């Protein structure tokens, strides 16, 4: 069984810990992508145009015998209206608000995707491909004292000592304006993801670290494929606590 070094809050190595079998799972990018896309689809809200969009006009057709097509035309004008091919007309087949856009994933596939994404967090090649900046040796396992940090300043000091804070700065200064219409729809900026901190149980660090740029803090019970592989790309830079490693034994089977 593989082992990993454990570090304290100053970044010094203080011992070793055995890694559970979940870190030996095969890398399955196909299952990871399937699970992440399903999670994103299941968050979608119903959307569609107004029932009367493009229909608010009194345009009527001229009838036969005038040498023009039988489309509705504005009053005192020859300009077409209402029909899909006219400017300002209705959509022919608009999105339906009643459509079911949710996706289902087999339970075994979803769990396999999580196991595979967990194993990818200790692969330096995959972590580097995601663009993370780090100096620490993977996997990064911290003592349980990390879970008791109550101040964001203390978390920053730990990340600096562990050689991970550069990745938080990458996310902080990597924010940029989104291309396309989304910037008008409440999602003006695109944000990068940085460090994922996994704790064994609900503890103060869940609030202490949550306001850092790109940082997510969760317990083992809340882990999912999207947290471990944002944007379907596995290999997220992850910090585990000793208790979190212990809870992974036999999880997601």
Swiss-Prot record:
Residue ranges annotated as compositionally biased, kind Basic residues, are: 82-94
Q: Name one Pfam family in it.
A: Ribosomal_L4
- Enumerate the Gene3D superfamilies for this protein: 3.40.1370.10
| SUPFAM superfamilies, per database record | Ribosomal protein L4 (SSF52166)
Regions annotated as coiled coil: none
**What does the entry give for GO biological process?**
translation
Q: Name one GO cellular component term.
A: ribosome
> What molecular functions are annotated in GO for this chain?
rRNA binding; structural constituent of ribosome
Biased composition, class Basic and acidic residues, residue ranges = 95-107
Q: Is Zinc included in the keywords of this UniProt record?
A: no
Region Disordered, annotated ranges: 62-107
Q: Which keywords appear in this protein's UniProt record, sorted alphabetically?
A: Ribonucleoprotein, Ribosomal protein, RNA-binding, rRNA-binding
Q: Does the keyword Ribonucleoprotein apply?
A: yes
The protein's superkingdom reads Archaea
The family annotation for this protein states:
Belongs to the universal ribosomal protein uL4 family.
Subunit (UniProt): Part of the 50S ribosomal subunit.
The entry's function note states: One of the primary rRNA binding proteins, this protein initially binds near the 5'-end of the 23S rRNA. It is important during the early stages of 50S assembly. It makes multiple contacts with different domains of the 23S rRNA in the assembled 50S subunit and ribosome. Forms part of the polypeptide exit tunnel.
Protein's name according to its UniProt entry: Large ribosomal subunit protein uL4
* Taxonomic source organism: Methanosarcina mazei (strain ATCC BAA-159 / DSM 3647 / Goe1 / Go1 / JCM 11833 / OCM 88)
Its lineage opens with: Archaea, Methanobacteriati, Methanobacteriota, Stenosarchaea group, Methanomicrobia
This chain is encoded by the gene named rpl4
């Amino acid at each position: 069984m593989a082992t990993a070094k454990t570090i304290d809050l100053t970044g010094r190595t203080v011992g070793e810990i055995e890694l559970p079998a979940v870190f030996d799972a095969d890398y399955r990018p196909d299952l990871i992508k399937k699970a992440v896309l399903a999670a994103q689809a299941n968050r979608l809200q119903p959307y569609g145009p107004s029932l009367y969009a493009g229909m608010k006009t009194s345009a009527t057709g001229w009838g036969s015998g005038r040498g023009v097509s039988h489309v509705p035309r504005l009053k005192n004008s020859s300009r077409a209206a209402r029909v899909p091919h006219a400017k300002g007309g209705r959509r022919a087949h608009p999105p339906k608000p009643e459509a079911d856009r949710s996706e289902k994933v087999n339970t075994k596939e979803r769990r396999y995707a999580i196991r595979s994404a967990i194993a990818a967090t200790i692969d330096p090649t995959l972590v580097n491909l995601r663009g993370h900046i780090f100096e620490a040796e993977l996997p990064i396992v911290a003592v349980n004292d990390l879970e008791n940090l109550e101040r964001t300043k203390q978390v920053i000091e730990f990340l600096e000592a562990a050689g991970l804070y550069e990745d938080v700065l990458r996310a902080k200064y990597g924010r940029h304006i989104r291309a396309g219409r989304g910037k008008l729809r409440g999602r003006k900026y695109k944000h990068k993801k940085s460090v994922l901190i996994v704790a064994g149980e609900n503890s103060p660090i869940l609030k202490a670290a949550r306001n850092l740029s790109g940082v997510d803090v969760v317990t083992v019970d809340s882990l999912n494929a999207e947290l471990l592989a944002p944007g379907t790309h596995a290999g997220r830079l992850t910090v585990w606590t000793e208790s979190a490693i212990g809870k992974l034994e036999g999880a997601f089977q």
